[in-house]
């Protein structure tokens, strides 16, 4: 449940930042944008869109697609790095979940605030001692680096001169598009669905809400903005699916094997409870749990090798 709440808060924060940035560009009475954000971020992207649209004769729709692809390719390594860190921490947390079960059980059964606080402190200490991040390795730096690129292409797609009067495949880029809105909702739903693949059933039930948060948010934003911006989000949705496919079917399996190999070579130490009243019981249970998990993982690993040899 905590992971689900964390994901919802992170998505809400990302959307809030995006909405904040969309309001940073001022528009004069003539409908022309101005200000520091526009001059710094929007103008270079707008010039690039104009170059492809007019100087290369490709039209504004194709120009927005090309520039969006360029931007997304540039920031794709950052997105994958962010996914790698988050997935690595998630796999480590999944590995340690049985080891921390005695503490989690005390946390669930705590009858007083003091008992609950003591169990939470033990859990945080155990996670810290084993190099686990409380924030899942998400980190803000990759997101902050990506945001200027997102905002630049967003402003350029909306305010580049000539875009509002252009058409693309029968769509008026200066008007709202229900068609693009529906497609965008589907794309981001698929991306959310892919993110749940390979997740344990218990956690998947908790993450169900996340399958609808992003698509619904994108629908509200797409339906209220011109088709030129929706076209940018359409291409962004395709890249999000590509990134999620790489994360789910390439990164996660590799990281899962990496974590198992790490702790097979260097088994985690039994965590000793700081709770004097339950110190012996907790330590004994934790030690037994450690040994059982390590033995199980070694057995599974050897069985896999024998199967491959056979």
Swiss-Prot record:
Cellular component GO terms, alphabetical: plasma membrane
GO terms assigned for molecular function: membrane insertase activity
Alphabetic keyword roster: Cell membrane, Chaperone, Lipoprotein, Membrane, Palmitate, Protein transport, Signal, Transmembrane, Transmembrane helix, Transport
Gene Ontology annotations of biological process type: protein insertion into membrane; protein transport
Lipidation (S-diacylglycerol cysteine): 24
Biased composition (Polar residues): 281-297
Keyword Cytoplasm: no
Identification of the protein by name: Membrane protein insertase YidC 2
Biased composition (Basic residues): 298-310
Subcellular location: Cell membrane
Function, as annotated: Required for the insertion and/or proper folding and/or complex formation of integral membrane proteins into the membrane. Involved in integration of membrane proteins that insert both dependently and independently of the Sec translocase complex, as well as at least some lipoproteins.
Lipid attachment locations (N-palmitoyl cysteine): 24
Record gene name: yidC2
Record PROSITE patterns: PROKAR_LIPOPROTEIN
Membrane topology, record value: Multi-pass membrane protein
Domain of life: Bacteria
First and last residue of the signal peptide: 1-23
InterPro entries, alphabetized: YidC/ALB3/OXA1/COX18, YidC/Oxa/ALB_C, YidC/YidC1/YidC2_Firmicutes, YidC_ALB_C
Annotated transmembrane regions: 33-53, 58-78, 135-155, 180-200, 219-239
Similarity comment: Belongs to the OXA1/ALB3/YidC family. Type 2 subfamily.
Xref: CDD domains: 5TM_YidC_Alb3
Region (Disordered): 262-310
